[in-house]
A protein has these predicted regions:
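Short helix/loop capping segments that flank catalytic or ligand/cofactor-binding pockets
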Residues: 67-69, 176-178, 335-338
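N-terminal phosphate-binding caps/lids of nucleotide- and nucleic-acid-binding domains
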Residues: 109, 159, 166, 186-197, ...
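GHKL/Bergerat-fold ATPase module in large chromosome/replication-associated machines
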Residues: 206-342
């Protein structure tokens, strides 16, 4: 089997990657999103940071997998649009951003391996190594032997399952990332799906030392509902935790005296506001019904101490900002933060 060359140069791929991803968390989230797009019921993320300068990241999804033809025709194409080209398969539910998942892998590592299989194709293993590559050269995916990966738990599960994809990334630099960074990664991953609505499941195993338990933990949606002052919802069942909730916030008087106030969270139905939106629109030549569904919440405070007092699930740091207006389409994240476009 011959190698498969990218159509863009190494320098162009690096440039696109740096523009798309601001940190390790955003790049890893993109790889996980690709697993959700592959219809995987489970996505397993392993991060081994025992040597932070040379960390190991592995994403295994139980999705449909890729054949050698899929790799050649789709995977290496930057900007391949699944929504337009595979409508029957994705049904408008694509989450990854138009064929740029491989840029996320390149952002994280100069060397990564793809092990993949579909129900109707044989298992193949590919490696991309750009270390030492000239800026004007085009990277090439090379077919490699599977022997060194046969002992991976994910490989054994893939063989047993008969379909799926494993991406192994070597020498990922995670120096300077501490507990807050990885806590923030879990928040970012949980934002990929709507609260309590996605049947697919994301699992994570963070290996920090030789004594770390060898088990995956589920990524659970965590929203600091009890720190919300106002909530606008199409269905109040989405925000049950806000019912009969009282929050506290600090303020200064005109004389500079620190005070605290408490108040009840106010919940307003979309039906009573201009937020109630529905109708019909043509999508890719097909007329479909659309309706704005969900909720918008306004935090009572972004002061860390007060917010944590209201709800210990509140997280805000250099790696994660909860003040986002996220848009979901059919239960999956379509726009991470609409506020940036307003």
């Amino acid at each position: 089997m011959d190698g498969i060359k990218f159509t863009l140069t190494y320098s162009a791929l690096k440039m696109f990657g740096k523009q798309l991803y601001s940190n390790v968390s955003s790049a890893i989230s993109e790889l996980v999103a690709n697993g959700l797009d592959a219809k995987a019921p489970n996505i397993y993320l392993t991060i081994d940071i025992r040597d932070k300068m040379n960390s190991y990241v592995e994403v295994f999804d139980e999705g449909k997998g890729m054949s050698a033809t899929d790799i050649a025709d789709h995977y290496i194409k930057i900007g391949y649009n699944k929504r337009r080209n595979e409508r029957g398969l994705n049904d408008g539910k694509t989450l990854g951003r138009k064929g740029i998942g491989k840029l996320a892998a390149l952002y994280l590592s100069d060397c990564f391996t793809i092990i993949t299989k579909t129900v109707n194709s044989e298992l193949t293993c590919w490696k991309l190594d750009v270390s030492g590559l000239d800026e004007d050269d085009s990277p090439q995916l090379e077919p490699v032997g599977i022997d060194e990966y046969c002992e991976l738990e994910s490989y054994k599960k893939l063989v047993s399952l008969g379909h799926g994809t494993i991406i192994c990334l070597q020498n990922v630099n995670m120096k300077g990332l501490g507990d807050k960074a990885f806590e923030s990664l879990e928040c970012r991953l949980s934002n990929l799906f709507l609260y309590d609505k996605l049947e697919q499941k994301i699992w994570i195993k963070l290996i920090q030392s030789n004594t770390t338990p060898n088990c995956f933990l589920p990524i659970n949606k965590q929203i600091a509902f009890k720190n919300l002052a106002y909530v606008y919802a199409s269905d109040k069942s989405y925000v049950k935790e806000c019912e009969h909730n009282t929050f506290t916030m600090s303020y200064k008087t005109k004389n500079g005296i620190d005070k605290k106030m408490t108040s009840d969270t106010e919940i307003v139905s979309f039906a009573d506001t201009e937020f109630h939106v529905s109708g019909e629109q043509e999508f890719f030549g097909v007329k479909k019904h659309y309706e704005l569904d969900g909720w918008i919440g306004i935090h009572a405070t972004i002061d860390g101490e007060d917010a944590k007092y209201n709800d210990d699930r509140y997280i805000k740091n250099q790696f994660y900002n909860p003040n986002q207006l996220r848009v979901y389409v059919r239960n999956k994240l379509a726009m991470p933060n609409m506020i940036e476009y307003l």
